Design a protein with these regions (language model features):
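Short amphipathic alpha-helices in soluble, non-transmembrane regions
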Residues: 404-414, 452-460
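Active-site C-terminal subdomain of aminotransferase-like
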Residues: 264-370
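N-terminal entrance/gating region of PLP-dependent enzymes' catalytic architecture
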Residues: 1-129, 418-424, 441-443, 447, ...
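Short loop-beta-helix segment that forms the pyridoxal 5′-phosphate
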Residues: 120-144, 188-189
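PLP-dependent enzyme catalytic core of the Aspartate aminotransferase-like
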Residues: 428-495
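Conserved PLP-binding active-site segment of the aspartate aminotransferase-like
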Residues: 382-395, 400, 419-454
């Protein structure tokens, strides 16, 4: 194992060196061709041996990877994992416990129980019956939250439950309602990217007292905005509706004593989604669903004689099958436990604060840049939307489609060249028109605003070259490198 691990680390380094940036150059077709060449044949008549196969496959993956440890990779809620978390994940793979029965995961089950109790207390510090389960991420957490709401309604003799979501809600909520056979969710109006309490009041009033679940968002995907949770909770309670908060992005703000007040009111929700593979720096997957009352998780319980026979449970063997909608389940909790124990609440909170502060400083850099402008309003949790002034000039000359086309072209060209990975979002501008923006989602726990400024120069230079074609004069000199980091395990994994 040690020898193979060394091979894998060498392959990661060699692949990253060959890539040379945050993303492989050439676009989808070239990347696919290079990757296939490096791993072929996938199923030879005679194998090449463990070390050669491992090196070839890992090097191919690294050479063709999007590297979130590079500050210029800032498109998505896609964090660079902490080295200690990646190392713990290696141990999880080596031990290979399956979390569906005690006889497959004796110690891992105890670790999960201890960790989920703490993760529940992060959300519900005053609730004596709070609990949490580990999920594969926000999509699964939201699905389970809606499932539990449906089961609670049916236990009260109701046929179903009506879900209400903001225009800003993550698509997984509507998909969960579809999967569960629930009525099509009612969409509640938003203003400036946040759900309007008055609009929620009108929507709930129209239901005439039918059972309802309001899904608020704490950290929208496009902008990192937080719904007005106290007001939404008050409106929901006035109609006897339940509240679920999708805090897949924003939930880890609760680790910071300074930032936790941004989520005031979240404790009034019956359930809360939050991810640790976003603002938590865990390898995917590391999701959490916290519930205010653990008895609601009873809806997940079932019997399978080979896993949790009645007599085994009565004899004292723990029943793990009701801790997930999955059966076979890897011990994702090991990396979470390692990180929480290593950093403590203050350490995790400090990293969250760093990302939030970096986003604020990055937004200030955009505001000072003569060729760029930021979307009006405060930056989201750690998300900044901006676009080149050259796009606005095209709007004046040829309309909104021309301006948006320039923004899209800048993003795609930088992707194809492997220079930068920026996201895209459609959001309302100061004049009420919805326009396309470049999106920087800043989750690097060590990067600074100075490390990120080259992104702005890349965008500005490309906007100039596309709006007014001329020979390229910039590009190669704008790559930023992070300063060396100190502290074993606190560094992120660079691929």
């Amino acid at each position: 194992m040690r020898a193979l691990t060394s091979v894998a680390l060498d392959a990661l380094a060699d692949g990253a060196a060959a890539r040379g940036g945050p993303l492989p150059h050439g676009g989808p077709d070239e990347v696919a061709a290079r990757t296939r060449a490096l791993i072929s044949p996938v199923l030879p008549e005679e194998g090449v041996g463990a070390q050669d196969a491992l090196y070839d496959v890992v090097r191919a993956a690294a050479q063709g990877a999007a590297d979130p440890s590079d500050p210029r990779c800032a498109a998505h809620l896609h964090c660079p994992p902490l080295a200690m978390a990646a190392a713990a994940d290696l141990a999880a793979s080596a031990l290979n416990p399956s979390m569906d029965s005690w006889d497959q995961a004796p110690a891992a089950a105890v670790i999960e129980e201890a960790v989920t109790a703490e993760l529940a207390r992060v959300v519900y510090p005053e609730a004596e019956a709070a609990d949490a389960i580990v999920t594969s991420g926000g999509t699964e957490s939201n699905l389970v939250a809606l499932l539990l709401a449906r089961e609670r309604a049916q236990a009260r003799g109701e046929r179903t439950v009506q879900v209400l979501v903001g225009e800003n809600a993550h698509h997984s909520v509507r998909r969960a309602a579809w999967i569960l056979g629930l009525p099509t969710p009612i969409t509640v109006d938003c203003r400036a990217g946040r759900m309007l309490p008055a609009a929620l009041d009108r929507a709930l009033a129209s239901l005439g007292g039918a059972p309802a679940l309001v899904v608020a968002t704490a950290g929208t995907t496009d902008e990192g905005l937080i719904d007005p949770l106290p007001q939404l909770a008050e409106v929901a309670a006035g109609f006897g509706a339940e509240l679920h908060v999708d805090a897949a992005y924003g939930g880890p703000l609760l680790f910071s004593r300074d930032l936790a007040p941004l989520l005031h009111g979240i404790e009034q929700a019956v359930s809360v989604t939050y991810d640790l593979h976003k603002l938590g720096w865990q390898p995917v997957a590391a999701g959490v669903l916290a519930v205010r009352d653990r008895t609601s998780l009873g809806a997940l319980s079932l019997r399978a004689d080979y896993l949790n026979a009645d007599d085994d449970t009565e004899a004292g063997l723990p029943d793990l099958l009701g801790r997930s909608i999955r059966t076979s389940r890897r011990p994702d909790v090991l990396k979470i436990a390692t990180t929480l124990r290593a950093l403590g609440r203050e350490g995790v909170g400090g990293l969250v604060e760093h990302c939030v502060d970096t986003a604020r400083r990055f937004a200030e850099s955009v505001d000072r840049h003569p060729a760029l402008r930021r979307r009006d309003g405060d930056a989201g949790i750690s998300t900044v939307l901006f676009r080149p002034l050259a796009a606005d000039a095209l709007v004046d000359e040829a309309g909104d489609e021309a301006g948006d086309a320039l923004v899209a072209a800048i993003r795609r060209e930088l992707l194809a060249e492997g220079r930068a990975v920026l996201g895209r979002a459609v959001a309302e501008d100061h004049d009420g028109v919805r326009r396309l923006w470049l999106k920087a989602t800043l989750l690097h726990p060590r990067a600074t605003a100075d490390d990120l400024r080259p992104l702005l120069e890349l965008v500005a230079e490309r906007a100039r070259s596309l709006a007014e074609p001329q020979p390229a004069t910039a590009g190669d000199a704008v790559a930023a490198t992070l300063p060396g980091q100190q502290g074993a395990g606190l560094e992120t994994v660079s691929v």
